[in-house]
Regions:
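Flexible phosphate-sensing "switch/lid" loops adjacent to ATP/NTP-binding sites
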Residues: 2-32, 39, 44-252, 256-263, ...
Length: 273
């Protein structure tokens, strides 16, 4: 007489995956989760990470670039920082790691990587304008986010990187950052700011904006701006080359995009953006 079989341990056994989700997790090397605010984008990114770790023998990183820092809450964690934090997943075949991008630390890492020598590195890191831009400027995280994604893919530490982005319009800004960085190094403004000192000052002095800025901010501040961009331009070659590689990564066939939305008209419109 056969013995009754025991019921599965639902607390630890992984529920079956939808076929499309299984294909997404199985074939992708990077998944970028986008959508309007308040529809569950962060929760979806976290759920995909847990599912990938449970059902596949993959090393998974879920990386949040959302300044609201909701990923830690979605996973029941006290906090996330700029370091990678292992997360225990029941019945996992693979592993799950979480991290949040700290903008200032990521910029500092990028400068240390690309500066041509220690002297320029130290001058940039000590520059007051640099500190302000990387700590307070609303779009300062856009480019370093894509750098961090590239690092995660190239490190060889992870088989799948899942990215929790800010609400849709901010996500578009992040994904467009490599192209904008390349354009910036070719811009007339950068050439003007980094021209030889005498010709730069003569040119600036003739422009109404800089005449007003000089009166309000002072010549010293304008000089600091010019110094910062002159130093930053010494890193043009490695940063532009890196931006091109990041752009290629974002359009790679192994990179997938998931748009999360709700049936609300406002959310649908935002998701379509």
């Amino acid at each position: 007489m056969s013995q009754p079989t025991s019921a599965p341990n639902t607390a630890t056994s992984a529920p079956p995956l939808d076929a499309q989700v299984a294909r997404l997790l199985g074939e992708s090397k990077m998944i970028i989760v986008c959508g309007p605010g308040g529809v569950g984008t962060t929760t979806s990114a976290a759920a995909l990470g847990v599912a990938a770790a449970r059902h596949f023998d993959k090393r998974v990183l879920v990386l949040t670039v959302d300044p609201a820092k909701r990923l830690a809450t979605a996973l029941g964690l006290a906090a996330l920082g700029n370091v990678e934090l292992p997360v225990q997943v029941a019945s996992a075949r693979g592993s799950l790691t979480m991290a949040m991008i700290d903008t200032k630390s990521s910029w500092d890492d990028m400068i240390r990587r690309h500066a041509p020598d220690d002297a320029i590195r130290d001058r940039v890191l000590a520059n007051d304008l640099y500190k302000t831009l990387t700590s307070r400027f609303v779009h300062s995280h856009d480019y370093v986010v894509t750098e961090r994604l590239f690092d995660a893919r190239e490190s060889g530490k992870f088989d799948l990187v899942i990215v929790d982005t800010p609400p849709s319009r901010s996500a578009v800004s992040v994904l467009d950052a490599p192209r904008r960085m390349q354009q910036f190094f070719g811009s007339r403004l950068l050439k003007l700011l980094t021209a030889p000192t005498q010709s730069r000052l003569l040119s600036l002095a003739s422009r109404p904006f800089f005449i007003v800025a000089d009166r309000i901010l002072g010549a010293a501040f304008l000089s600091d701006i010019a110094e910062f961009f002159t130093l930053f331009r010494t890193m043009e070659a490695p940063i532009v080359a890196r931006a091109r590689r990041v752009g290629s990564l974002l359009s790679d066939s192994a990179t997938s995009y998931v748009v999360v939305t709700s049936a609300e008209p406002v959310a649908l419109n935002e998701a379509g953006y």
